[in-house]
């Protein structure tokens, strides 16, 4: 993300701060020594796998599945999962919590604010069609602040 010129440095810093504040154990340290021993189709992705190994992660959630082949990740008991599949699985496990999280997320969006329909349309554009197919019938349950 740091090399993505469409994202302003301030936005990246805001996301980093929010992740660190709200996601327990979101910062993994001490993984650097693992990087050189890893082989992935894109060498610039090795730090992601190294952090997953160091952090004892079971899953790497990424749109970039081609650069995280499960055949290679299997040796580390890690799997790569598309965000649409990951979110859909979470919904199947606990739909109520996912609806609550969606509601909190929608209500946190202020500039511009989103209706439930606009929010779901945005998720659809972000390549999350299966997840949206679960949420759309429940959109009337999403209360806006």
Language model feature labels by segment:
Residues 1-31, 105-127:
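PIN-domain endoribonuclease scaffold, especially VapC-family toxins
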Residues 14-20, 35, 55, 68-69, ...:
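Short, functional N-terminal and low-complexity linear motifs
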Residues 24-59, 93-94, 113, 126-145:
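Active-site neighborhoods of divalent-metal-dependent phosphate/nucleic-acid chemistry enzymes
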